[in-house]
Swiss-Prot record:
Reaction equations catalysed: ATP + H2O = ADP + phosphate + H(+)
Residue span, SF3 helicase domain: 302-457
Motif RCR-3 per UniProt: ranges: 141-145
Protein name per UniProt: Initiator protein NS1
Residues where ATP binds: 328-335
Phenotype when changing residue 177 to C: Complete loss of nuclear localization. Complete loss of NS1-mediated nuclear translocation of host E2F4 and E2F5, although still up-regulating their expression
pH dependence of function: Optimum pH is 7.0-7.5.
Motif (Nuclear localization signal): 177-180
Cofactor mode of binding and number, as noted: The endonuclease active site can probably bind other divalent cations.
Subcellular location: Host nucleus
SUPFAM superfamilies per record: Origin of replication-binding domain, RBD-like, P-loop containing nucleoside triphosphate hydrolases
Organism the protein comes from: Human parvovirus B19 (strain HV)
Alphabetical list of PROSITE patterns matching this protein: PV_NS1_NUC, SF3_HELICASE_1
């Protein structure tokens, strides 16, 4: 219960108007352990006791109030002042002054001969808010005063009823036990599990509290269970509850307090990984359809290994490797994946370069820090190293001073090398080694399909829940020695749920379409440069359209008006989706030295059954490889469908499609 406090001034003129009822009052005052009351002091004691007696049997807003009244002498002038500490279920800042003045003036009306009224001055802060710390005010100020400074005191608060007029107790050097203010009315304390005995502790014992405190605790736990940490999320989850709380000033304050406690509990008392896991495991069974899994497979990473590392990293169990760095060109899914993970945690912050003086203004008190398009300047390199390494540090905040930042996981996305430290117009690699020791780098090199869309929290929860349910043996073998570059995919260790394209070993099965391996190998490259390969206006079909089986539509021949989809256009989330990137040995293909051609994997080297003729991946890799070799010898012959018959060379030079197809990209960059 909130206890308000204030002061009533009683001048000497009021006592001059005392009538016979006041002077001749027969009210019994127990002064056995108190200084004797004489003259006007006795009048004030009678007046205070009369007010307390009337308050005990009154109704209206003052019904059931807790009160503590103490009258004292003025120091510098004649007269008295009364300290009033009062609170009840019907009292609030709006009616406090009216109720207190009405109570005291109603009693005073029958004790004076003239119409005299007292004015109540409530205790208020500099911002105009009422003090609600009556309990602390009694304990730390009023009860420490002794006679003769105190004339009289009355109260109905358990623990102070007998001690408030005990001079021996007040003169004690310290109290044996802090009295506790009963915060319930009638049977409320027993319902809430509190004891109403004298001398109990202020802090509830064994986690028990009042109905209001238990309700507030339940609200905080509900926010954490439903992953509600912002007002906007609260409105979406339970708009009715939010509206009811927002209808009053105290309810609005309760909303802010509950959200702060829920965020603190989620960031400090509960592992962050619990918010990244799905509660219903049945919804994570079809993991091969997960967008994040497809994205990681596209980027040549094992989704299981990456997911298990993310779970360790988000719980700050990776030691100094406190940072994930997604590095690569634009449109490869870096920021998409980073923001999906960030939106799944309770609360995340971002490094903001709009104000270079306070880039880490939004880092304190967060579960995760997102550093998009990161760049490190010499002025903040030491603070950056501490944050990236998960070490506690202090950062400056705008108009707030410095604030402590504990170890917080960091995810970085960038197109450039963040290990370069920028100082003015110069860059240095002095800190590169120290920065790399704090990061795990994932290279995103393959452009994503425009059909991918944004990754959602459900995708993250499905992916990480599946990873958490699998064996951690593969991850533990790598985690023994953390490396700067995250290890690429290992076909032998890939989980069976992720192997969507099994390798064909039966030599009796021919390639699709009834074509021979030689015809399919020869035509695969020409499908890459077919006139319709760059036609982006025609919608793609889920059914593959057969390409040309020979080079009839190649450069120099007439162009067919029929739009023919290339084989690489049908690829979705595979390394072959970026056909115009030069192949990397050991990443995109393995060289078969015996037969002198590239194959898709080690198992197809020197394959007696002719792996190239049976595996479609080997055919695509061979066509891709031969295409780059062809471009080296004929760099100016290949044109896109729009410029096959173009006579103006500038039209070809400015066409990005022609540049990719003909190998003119290096020439254009040079010029």
């Amino acid at each position: 219960m909130e206890l308000f406090r204030g002061v009533l001034q009683v001048s000497s003129n009021v006592l001059d108007c005392a009538n016979d009822n006041w002077w001749c009052s027969l009210l019994d005052l127990d002064t056995s352990d108190w200084e004797p009351l004489t003259h006007t002091n006795r009048l004030m004691a009678i007046y205070l006791s009369s007010v307390a007696s009337k308050l005990d049997f009154t109704g209206g807003p003052l019904a059931g109030c807790l009160y503590f009244f103490q009258v004292e002498c003025n120091k510098f002038e004649e007269g008295y002042h009364i300290h009033v500490v009062i609170g009840g279920p019907g009292l609030n800042p709006r009616n406090l002054t009216v109720c207190v003045e009405g109570l005291f003036n109603n009693v005073l009306y029958h004790l004076v001969t003239e119409n005299v009224k007292l004015k109540f001055l409530p205790g208020m802060t500099t911002k105009g808010k009422y003090f609600r710390d009556g309990e602390q005010f009694i304990e730390n100020y009023l009860m420490k005063k002794i006679p003769l400074n105190v004339v009289w005191c009355v109260t109905n608060i358990d623990g102070y009823i007998d001690t408030c007029i005990s001079a021996t107790f007040r003169r004690g050097a310290c109290h044996a036990k802090k009295p506790r203010i009963t915060t319930a009315i009638n049977d409320t304390s027993s319902d809430a599990g509190e004891s109403s005995g004298t001398g109990a502790e202020v802090v509830p014992i064994n986690g028990k509290g009042t109905k209001a405190s238990i309700k507030f605790q339940t609200m905080v736990n509900w926010l954490c269970e439903n992953r509600v940490f912002t007002e906007d999320k609260w409105k979406l989850v339970d708009f009715n509850q939010y509206t009811l709380l927002s209808s009053s000033h105290s309810g609005s304050f309760q909303i802010q307090s509950a959200l702060k406690l829920a965020i603190y509990k989620a960031t400090n008392l509960v592992p962050t990984s619990t918010f990244l896991l799905h509660t219903d495991f049945e919804q994570v069974m079809c993991i091969k359809d997960n967008k994040i899994v497809k994205l990681l497979l596209c980027q040549n990473y094992d989704p299981l290994l990456v997911g298990q590392h993310v779970l360790k990293w988000i719980d700050k169990k990776c030691g100094k490797k406190n940072t994930l760095w997604f590095y690569g060109p634009p449109s490869t899914g870096k920021t998409n994946l980073a923001m999906a993970i960030a939106k799944s945690v309770p609360v995340y912050g971002m490094v903001n370069w709009n104000n270079e003086n306070f880039p880490f203004n939004d880092v304190a008190g967060k579960s995760l820090v997102v550093w998009d398009e990161g760049i490190i300047k010499s002025t903040i390199v030491e603070a950056a190293k501490a944050i990236l390494g998960g070490q506690p540090t202090r950062v400056d905040q705008k108009m707030r001073g410095s604030v402590a930042v504990p170890g917080v996981p960091v995810v970085i996305t960038s197109n450039g090398d963040i290990t370069f430290v920028v100082s003015g117009n110069t860059t240095t690699t002095v800190h590169a080694k120290a920065l790399k020791e704090r990061m795990v780098k994932l290279n995103f090199t393959v452009r994503c399909s425009p059909d991918m869309g944004l990754l959602t929290e459900a995708d993250v929860q499905q992916w990480l829940t599946w990873c958490n349910a699998q064996s951690w043996d593969h991850y533990e073998n790598w985690a023994i020695n953390y490396t700067f570059d995250f290890p690429g995919i290992n076909a032998d260790a890939l989980h069976p749920d992720l192997q969507t394209t099994p390798i064909v070993t039966d030599t009796s099965i021919s390639s699709s379409g009834g074509e021979s391996s030689e015809e399919l190998s020869e035509s695969s490259f020409f499908n890459l440069i077919t006139p319709g390969a760059w036609n982006t206006e025609t919608p793609r079909s889920s059914t593959p359209i057969p390409g040309t089986s020979s080079g009839e539509s190649f450069v120099g021949s007439s162009v067919s008006s029929e739009v023919v989809a290339a084989s690489w256009e049908e690829a979705f989330y595979t390394p072959l989706a970026d056909q115009f990137r030069e192949l990397l040995v050991g990443v995109d293909y393995v060289w078969d030295g015996v037969r002198g051609l590239p194959v898709c994997c080690v198992q197809h080297i020197n394959n007696s059954g002719g792996g190239l003729g049976l595996c479609p991946h080997c055919i695509n890799v061979g066509a891709w490889y031969n295409g780059w070799k062809f471009r080296e010898f004929t760099p100016d012959l290949v044109r896109c469908s729009c410029h096959v018959g173009a006579s103006n060379p500038f039209s070809v030079l400015t066409c990005k499609k022609c540049a990719y197809l003909s190998g003119l990209q290096s020439f254009v960059d040079y010029e």
